[in-house]
């Protein structure tokens, strides 16, 4: 299943491997929403999907709230505005208008993602979207993906929050999947960078949440730092293709780590009040 957005680090291509390490549970919690590829490819009873990027979360909320209105407005924009001057006018309004509604900002965000250079999402220090025009002949309008997303989104809660804030909201039995900005390859985290200190802090919080009994699964690049930070997790290695961030028309592969916390019990979780599954889960390797 493809996603609404083009997105750096999109997990669609590796989903068959990633799903092997996602155990059953009443809710999947994702502190780094990205393209929502994991939500779309899994079947948890409910989801808590978070991201620090308010434009991303606003898009998801607006599609979930009124899919048909969103499709109707966005389709028109795709039909009439595939021109460089239109792109920069829309980007200007997206960045600076004080009168733009949240609904139209969501429509513009999809437009900018699909018409901007290589689907990148980048902001300057002032918080302004600054990706140049992509000059594509016929940008794809993801109507089918929007409808599928809107259906699945009825099981989800979307919040604009940091990973700290999101992980503080865990409930008994929650499964945690984290796909943070990758070490050594990508530093963008909305307007601020995602530093080595952030990697250390995230790993510390995830170690603690794992010790509480939460299944924790983390994707990241295969670097010495990541192997060290998640040394108490089981490591699985996969090859993933990269297309965003390399020369146009090219792709390359890189090794990624899927770090999986050890199997634990869901202490205090009563399946009779939630999903019909065992109180003990087993990570499949």
Curated annotation (Swiss-Prot):
Gene (name only): dam
Gene Ontology molecular function: S-adenosyl-L-methionine binding; sequence-specific DNA binding; site-specific DNA-methyltransferase (adenine-specific) activity
Family: Belongs to the N(4)/N(6)-methyltransferase family.
Family matches, as SUPFAM superfamilies: S-adenosyl-L-methionine-dependent methyltransferases
Reaction catalysed by this enzyme: a 2'-deoxyadenosine in DNA + S-adenosyl-L-methionine = an N(6)-methyl-2'-deoxyadenosine in DNA + S-adenosyl-L-homocysteine + H(+)
Transferase keyword on record: yes
Gene Ontology BP annotations: DNA replication; DNA restriction-modification system; methylation; mismatch repair
Enzyme class: transferase
Source organism (scientific name): Escherichia coli
UniProt: S-adenosyl-L-methionine binding residues: 7, 11, 51, 179
Protein name, entry field: Retron Ec67 DNA adenine methylase
Function according to Swiss-Prot or TrEMBL: May play a regulatory role in the functions of the retron.
Keyword Membrane: no
Pfam families, per database record: MethyltransfD12
Lineage, uppermost ranks: Bacteria, Pseudomonadati, Pseudomonadota, Gammaproteobacteria, Enterobacterales
Keywords, sorted A to Z: DNA replication, Methyltransferase, S-adenosyl-L-methionine, Transferase, Transposable element
Superkingdom of the source species: Bacteria
UniProt feature coiled coil, ranges: none
InterPro entries named among the record's database cross-references: Ade_MeTrfase_dom_2 (IPR023095), DNA_methylase_N6_adenine_CS (IPR002052), M_m6A_EcoRV (IPR012263), MeTrfase_D12 (IPR012327), SAM-dependent_MTases_sf (IPR029063)
EC nos: 2.1.1.72
């Amino acid at each position: 299943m493809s996603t609404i957005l083009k997105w750096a680090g999109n997990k669609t291509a590796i989903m068959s491997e990633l799903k092997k390490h996602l155990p059953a549970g009443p809710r999947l919690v994702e502190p780094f929403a990205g393209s929502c590829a994991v939500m779309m490819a899994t079947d948890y009873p409910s989801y808590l999907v978070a991201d620090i990027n308010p434009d991303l979360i606003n898009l998801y909320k607006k599609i979930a709230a009124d899919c048909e209105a969103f499709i109707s407005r966005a389709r028109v924009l795709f039909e009439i505005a595939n021109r460089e001057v239109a792109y920069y006018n829309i980007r200007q309004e997206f960045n600076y208008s004080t009168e733009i509604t949240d609904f139209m900002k969501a429509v513009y965000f999809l437009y900018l993602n699909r018409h901007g250079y290589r689907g990148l999402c980048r902001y300057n220090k002032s918080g302004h979207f600054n990706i140049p025009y992509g000059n594509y002949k016929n940008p794809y309008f993801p109507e089918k993906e929007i409808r599928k997303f809107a259906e699945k989104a009825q099981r989800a809660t979307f919040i604009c929050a940091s990973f700290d804030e999101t992980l503080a909201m865990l409930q008994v039995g929650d499964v945690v999947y984290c796909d943070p900005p990758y070490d050594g390859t990508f530093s963008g985290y909305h307007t601020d960078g995602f530093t080595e200190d952030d990697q250390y802090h995230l790993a510390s919080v995830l170690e603690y949440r794992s010790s509480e009994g939460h299944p924790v699964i983390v994707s990241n690049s295969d670097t010495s730092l990541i192997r060290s930070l998640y040394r108490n997790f089981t490591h699985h290695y996969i090859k993933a293709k990269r297309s965003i961030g390399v020369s146009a028309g090219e792709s390359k592969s890189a090794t990624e780590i899927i770090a999986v916390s050890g199997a634990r019990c869901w202490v205090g979780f009563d399946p009779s009040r939630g999903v019909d599954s065992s109180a003990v889960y087993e990570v499949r390797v």
